[in-house]
């Protein structure tokens, strides 16, 4: 069975069992339990793959227990997605209503229904994060292996939440490329590539040099992953991305794409941009104006250059590690698939 299919099977079975236990407490909890299962329905499973190859690159063999531990990285992601969609008030994810939108039906006859639905979605994300830790702890790997990796979970949570906080605090402020890259680094890059690799390595008993190499490979690659996401967020096809492509502009979010556009723009162009950013209900024409301005300033090309430079840096670091050929090939392929995509 292909790796992604193995991870999908672990997640669907584990979360279905937990959702049943949760819904068994009271019939009213059924819609909330349904969102637990909905959260794990889609995904590329990149985080699980990086954890898996962080283990395999040390010389450890394939293991069903390791696949379960690696799958827990996806539950961290699912939790982060539910919370991020809630914070950003995003209506769609994978072409389907986000949790805080879908749960409105469960509270439609109650006072302040939208706020109640948002509260339920917040708790869905909280429970998914708890389930991530449970899946990891019950993966079947020896306790000594798990103990080596457990401290990294606290680091991952701290840095992920710091990144989300930084995005909130910087939303609507003056665009700044360095500040945007810091948000990317902590909100996405670390928990997408670096931390899964380090956790896989710690489980396998990786030494200091290899762990440092994982970070040298993982950080620039994680940044490139999110830079690609930012481009797709505005220029991608919503039918492929499954997300509304107005979110970043309407929300005036601190993306590197916006920051580079601002840096390259002159006075008149900045004024045009200022009138469009953060405007509720921006129509298609307004979004097209933003895209046209960005293209005229070649801001997307600048982001493409940043992506290419980071992928090159990442693969250069990988070459220095002298990993087993199968692990090096897998991590090279993951770097390409993470950054050269349409969704």
Named regions from a protein language model:
Residues 35-36, 40, 70-76, 153-160, ...:
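Short alpha-helical scaffolding segments that buttress acidic/His motifs in well-ordered protein cores
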Residues 1-78, 82-83, 87-110, 114, ...:
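Conserved N-terminal diphosphate/IPP-binding helix and adjacent helical/loop segment
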Residues 94-125, 174-190, 212, 216, ...:
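Divalent-cation-assisted or electrostatically stabilized phosphate/pyrophosphate-binding catalytic cores
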Residues 288-343:
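Short hairpin/turn module used for nucleic-acid contact or packing/dimerization
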Residues 52-56, 81, 130-138, 198-202, ...:
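Short glycine/serine- and small hydrophobic-enriched flexible loop segments
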Residues 1-7, 66-72, 146-153, 211-217, ...:
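Hydrophobic packing residues in well-ordered alpha-helices of helical domains and bundles
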